[in-house]
Amino acid sequence: MKKYILILFLFPLLVFSQKTISKEEKEVKKFQKELNEEYLNSKETPLRGDNFTNFKEHPFFPFDLKYRVTANFVKTENSEPFEIPTSSGKTKQYKEYGKASFQLDGKPYTLTLYQSLDLLKQEKYKDYLFLPFRDATNEKETYGGGKYMDLKIPKGNTIILDFNQSYQPYCAYNAYDYNCPIVPEENKLPVEIRAGVMYNDIYHH
């Protein structure tokens, strides 16, 4: 009888705890699931050989709402195309689309958002924005070359930057088959962004 009463008592607590997962955290879990599935798919993964065979899932920082910020967005008018150097020594053409300014722990930061001229040729990427950045976790818990975020053109003057959905470039896992844009100097943050994908440097040995 006592065991039955205990179950009745705990059940609503379990139900309540399941309901407390926020919409934002669900979005991050979806991102993590899709990223793992991509790397497990032999047709999509950048991994090769034993790295692919041994891959199970990415390590992630714990979800932290602190790293989901609403930034003020200012579009860059009449920006000219320019070349961003890549990890292979080649270059890729981009143009600056705008600036995103936000606060983290009470301090202001600004990051530049870009558009890939190659991707602009494809209809499905017309509203795609590219945000490469570096932070103080690089070469420790994250890839030394920095991380990326995929965003969409905002409709107003604000944009959500969810660093929980930041990921490492393909070059972090396969430096031979990919050439990845190097993070511009203006997008190097002097603070730790403990969010998104972590990195185990087992891929370049």
Spans of features found by a protein language model:
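Bacterial Sec-dependent N-terminal signal peptides
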Residues: 1-23
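Mid-length scaffold segments of soluble, non-membrane domains
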Residues: 80-144
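Extended, aromatic/histidine-rich regions of cofactor-dependent oxidoreductases associated
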Residues: 21-25, 167-205
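Terminal leader/tail segments of proteins
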Residues: 67, 79-86, 98, 186, ...
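Short, surface-exposed linear segments at secondary-structure transitions and domain or protein termini
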Residues: 118-126, 151-159, 201
